[in-house]
Amino acid sequence: MTQVPGVGRHRIAVPHQAEPLSLVSQDGIALAAMHLPNPSSSTAIVVAHGFGGAHDQERVERIAQLLNEESSVVAVTQRGHGDSGGMTTLGHREPMDVEAAVAWAREAGYDRVVTVGFSMGAAVVLRHAALLGPGSSDAVVAVSGPAYWFYRGTTPMRWLHRGISTPAGRAYIRTALGTRVDPEPWPDPPPMPPTEAAARVREHGIDLLIVHGDADGFFPLDHPRALHEAGPGSELWIEPGFGHAEGAIEEELVRRIGTWAMQGAGRGASPELSG
């Protein structure tokens, strides 16, 4: 095992087959990433973590390894997180980070690229595909993502908004999570909301899978249902007992997502778990 340098108690040793990558976003942010090749696959899955994550965080790397059983994987640490530069803009500029990983995969020769995002990363992969259209992603998977910006309807989200909105809160987040939050406010009007992004993804003819747990403590079920309704032809899996994002997802569900990513819409779902 090769140790990847970095701060944070959740970093782990990356397996020998992982190839460390140094990417640069369109606006010049240095991004840490890794490539897990699968010689039998011409598909690459790009993994976008949630707020506070990183590509070498244990729970993210576990997901990447499971997806790597069927496909190659490119996992990117988004700006303001881990060893990447810059500050997080909470989904505003992060589509450029995903595009850096997608572009690398295309240049590496992969025929298909599927983006899989968790929580904040779910909103990011939706906006990435919506903004860039056909030729960006061949399919999109949004796991535990929000449908609306500025949501404060649950206790965790109220605490998060309090944290990111004050200097003391941002300092605490940096100390506790190693995540640097940009103090600049979002533009007015704000970026394209996830529901509009889901609609555009489907208008572009890009396959879209929305995955959400009925035990999610951050975003209740009106969020995935709104995304599904906004994107006609999207697929919705409501997963019994699943909590929120990378920290709660079971291996079996990750493998089903990997199967869907490899085979397309309508594959990998269990009827009793699909909605």
What is each stretch, according to the model?
Residues 209-215, 240:
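Conserved strand-to-loop "acid loop" that flanks and positions the catalytic carboxylate
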Residues 1-24, 29-38, 246:
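An N-terminal hydrophobic leader/cap segment in hydrolases
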Residues 51-64, 78:
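The serine-hydrolase catalytic nucleophile loop
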Residues 89-108:
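Alpha/beta-hydrolase active-site loop
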Residues 64-85:
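Conserved alpha/beta-hydrolase
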Residues 134-187:
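Hydrolase active-site cap/lid region
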Residues 201-204, 210-212:
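Short beta-strand/loop motif that positions the catalytic acidic residue
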